[in-house]
Design a protein with these regions (language model features):
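A short, basic/flexible loop-to-alpha-helix module at the beginning of a structural domain
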Residues: 280, 293-306
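Cysteine-centered iron-sulfur cluster-binding motifs in ferredoxin-type domains/subunits
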Residues: 73-83, 116-120
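Reductase modules of NAD(P)H-dependent flavoproteins
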Residues: 2-78, 89-110, 334-454
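Residue-level marker of beta-strand positions
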Residues: 60, 84, 126, 173, ...
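Histidine-anchored nucleotide/phosphate-binding helix
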Residues: 317-331
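Fe-S ferredoxin-like electron-transfer domains
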Residues: 26-34, 102-159, 164, 184
């Protein structure tokens, strides 16, 4: 009897459980019908009621527009951190989300400004976007070359399809699509250009020391990332990028010498995925196909006659090279004083130096200044330090580039606040330059920087 009763109780419990699950499933389906329409919804763009976009609901507005070949800029790949995919949503966008309020002022919210990657398409919408967005295209490009120009930086060159051109302003950027892909770092080629006098092993020792060959990147879903172009408009139907590989955060261990001195030693990486797009790019070989879209950007040359000072480091070289090559190779500018201050850890981190020295020879109004920050490498690099800006014997300076610029030029300048400053580099460099310019009293209208190129 006890066993029979237990079986009946178990059967009743199962029946109740199944019934509850069925009720919840029906409720979920009904809720989904209310929250996400089952048919297409329409998106009216810039008041064009005659040609609305008919789309499936459920995805972000950024993704939906991309599927319709309308490519809003997004340096973070839709992660909600860069806020570059702003647009006006006049109806159908729902309430502004907390993730958007971090990037929008009260005035912008009142003007219906939204962050497209954070807005889900659930109903008919009316939106406004800048007209220049319609000039953005997407191509399947072919990799021409992919050499290392520094230890962790590639010069990545792709060719557009025959007959296609990328009409852009110097300082613009493109977005690279990254497919579902796994990348094994041991298969990467980090050779410099064949003409490099250091030879094919130039960067291998540091990759060995930092155990980069053992890293693996897994990308489970399509993504995209933004990179500033290093080429200028007159360089044909190519896109040239300087991309730094993003390794996981390193781990360190501390040991003591027999003398009791504490030494920090590299101890591998945290279990974090390497940079998705940078790993993907580093793995590309000549002939491979890569999808890019563009042009985007707002880091452009200002049409004034003011003196220009450029400050760069790392992969921040890219948009600055684009500017300077356009200024001197295309515009042939002779009536503006221009200087470029670029810093690296050691000699092997400097690149394009010969190209800028050639511009110096041709244009007396341009000067190029370089500095190394790793003092431990100076002797091995055979570096001859400049005593000051008038020292013709020294090769370059020693120190962080913003401090080198301040000590050797800006401090003695009669009106540093009247100079236009253009800069791009690692986050710490950008922050240091911003503080320096603020201390000098430079107004915002004389400051332009690219915050993701480095």
């Amino acid at each position: 009897m006890i066993i029979l009763f237990s079986l009946k109780t178990l059967g009743l419990a199962v029946a109740v459980f199944v019934t509850v699950i069925m009720i919840l499933s029906v409720m979920l389906i009904e809720a989904r019908k209310k929250l996400v329409p089952q048919g297409n919804v329409s998106i009216i763009v810039n008041g064009d009621t005659e040609n609305p976009l008919l789309v499936q609901p459920g995805s972000s507005l950024l993704t939906v527009l991309s599927d319709q070949s309308i490519f809003l800029p997004s340096a973070c790949g839709g992660g909600g951190t860069c806020a570059m995919c702003e647009c006006h949503i006049d109806s159908g966008g729902g309430d502004v989300l907390p993730t958007e309020l971090n990037h929008l002022s009260r005035k912008e919210v009142a003007e219906n400004m939204r962050i497209a990657c954070q807005v889900k398409v659930r109903e008919n919408m009316e939106i406004r976007i800048p007209e220049e967005i319609f000039g953005i295209k997407k191509w399947e490009c072919t990799v021409r070359s992919n050499y290392n120009v520094a230890t962790f930086i590639k010069e990545f060159i792709v060719e557009l399809p025959n007959g296609e051109t990328l009409d852009f302003q110097s300082g613009g950027y493109v977005q690279i699509d990254v497919p579902v892909v796994d990348v094994d770092f041991k298969n990467m080629n980090i050779d410099p250009h064949p003409s490099d006098p250091f030879g094919t092993d130039k960067f291998r020792s540091e990759w060995d020391d930092y155990q980069l060959w053992g890293l693996k990147m897994k990308n489970p879903e399509p993504q995209f990332r933004a990179y500033s172009m290093a080429n200028h408009p007159a360089e044909g139907n190519i896109v040239m990028l300087n991309i730094r590989v993003a390794s996981p955060p390193p781990q360190w261990k501390f040991t003591k010498t027999p003398e009791g001195k504490s030494i920090r030693e590299f101890d591998g990486y945290l279990p974090v995925n390497p940079g998705v797009c940078s790993s993907y790019v580093f793995d590309q070989k000549p002939g491979d196909k890569v999808t890019i879209s563009g042009p985007y950007g707002e880091f452009f040359i200002k049409p004034t006659k003011k003196e220009m000072v450029y400050i760069g480091g790392g992969a921040g070289m890219a948009p600055l090279r684009s500017h300077l090559f356009h200024i001197f190779h295309t515009m042939k500018t002779t009536d503006r004083k221009v200087s470029y201050w670029y810093g690296g850890r050691s000699r092997r981190e400097l690149f394009y130096t010969d190209q800028f020295r050639e511009i110096e020879k041709e244009f007396p109004n341009f000067s190029y200044h370089i500095a190394l920050s790793d003092r431990a490498m100076l002797e091995a690099d055979g570096w001859t330090e400049k005593k000051d800006i008038n020292d013709k014997d020294g090769e370059g300076y020693v120190g962080f580039i913003h401090q080198v610029l301040l000590d050797n030029y800006l401090t003695a300048h009669p009106e540093p606040e009247e100079i236009e400053y253009y800069f791009c580099g690692p986050p710490m460099m950008n922050a240091a330059v911003i503080k320096m310019l603020d201390d000098l009293g430079v107004p915002e209208e004389n400051i332009a920087f690219d915050d993701f190129g480095g």
